[in-house]
Amino acid sequence: MKTWQDCVAFHGHECGGLTIGYKASLYAIELLNLEFSADEQVVCIAENDACGVDGIQVMLGCSIGKGNLLFHMRGKQAFSFYNRKTGTSVRLVLKPKPEGMTREESFAYYQSCEPKDMFDVKDATIQLPEKARLFDSYVCDCCGETTGANWIR
């Protein structure tokens, strides 16, 4: 299994946001019996594009290029995880932290928390997307650039 240090190496620095994604991944692994996703077995739909997403990429193997990391932007620290193998899913929503903390205090707080104490566990409300599809490419009549068929009108 990947480690916190793997997440830091990928992201470039330690921070509270990275910790959120790392701990969300650990909790999803526990709740859904997940393993690192070599292909599209694990799907994550993130409701933000903040630092925590990097932790999820490292820990679970979700990526935009593979089509198993998607964004449903709502500005929330919430992540829906899906196990295609078992058909199970969960939505983890970050609980509010104590008010008035500095960045350093927030980081220390999140580092000290158990994942179960950080997140509310809810049903995933976004339908599991279909597996990524490959599209033919065509030269666009307007610009002359090669474009995926799904974008040509």
Name each model feature, range by range:
Residues M1-I126:
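Long, charged N-terminal interaction/targeting segments
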Residues C140-G144:
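Short cysteine-rich clusters marking metal-coordination/redox-active sites
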